[in-house]
């Protein structure tokens, strides 16, 4: 059995887990998430906890039990607490402004960049150089943050660009004569 799958997932109050024929749905205060179940993994709900076990002793079944446990743990945390990624804009004239479900970016290009947010993702701009991406789906929050960062990733000489708040950009030394 996977070491990850040995730990059960606690279901907090206000979170509802429903099993379908081949999928599981988790509903909570921040929305509803769903994922497909693996045929080789047995998932049980008892006493407010989800437990995971491989149905057979194959390497694939053991691996998928840990993977499914991690996915369901992220879903439970997402619908109860939510996830967020913080981005910073570093550079002269770099600005961000949230308007509804669109993020307008001014990143030194000859044109403004408008990034439309997918369903389930909220974006906030506390200041003109900070972006907060929030949502219940951990994978989608990270994907949207990576897409925003990809418009202008930090360059290695001055560090200008869009970076994660906890990212450390190692600067290169300029060429000396």
From Swiss-Prot:
SUPFAM superfamilies the UniProt entry points to: Ribosomal protein L6 (SSF56053)
GO molecular function, a single term: structural constituent of ribosome
Keywords: Ribonucleoprotein, Ribosomal protein, RNA-binding, rRNA-binding
Keyword RNA-binding applies: yes
GO cellular component, one term: cytosolic large ribosomal subunit
Pfam (any one): Ribosomal_L6
InterPro entries from the UniProt entry: Ribosomal_uL6-like, Ribosomal_uL6-like_a/b-dom_sf, Ribosomal_uL6_a/b-dom, Ribosomal_uL6_bac-type, Ribosomal_uL6_CS
GO biological process annotation, one example: cytoplasmic translation
Keyword field contains rRNA-binding: yes
UniProt-listed PROSITE patterns: RIBOSOMAL_L6_1
Protein family (similarity comment): Belongs to the universal ribosomal protein uL6 family.
Function: This protein binds to the 23S rRNA, and is important in its secondary structure. It is located near the subunit interface in the base of the L7/L12 stalk, and near the tRNA binding site of the peptidyltransferase center.
NCBIfam families reported in the protein's UniProt record: L6_bact
PANTHER family: 60S/50S RIBOSOMAL PROTEIN L6/L9, LARGE RIBOSOMAL SUBUNIT PROTEIN UL6M
Subunit structure: Part of the 50S ribosomal subunit.
Name the record gives this protein: Large ribosomal subunit protein uL6
Organism phylogeny: Bacteria, Pseudomonadati, Pseudomonadota, Betaproteobacteria, Neisseriales
Gene field: rplF
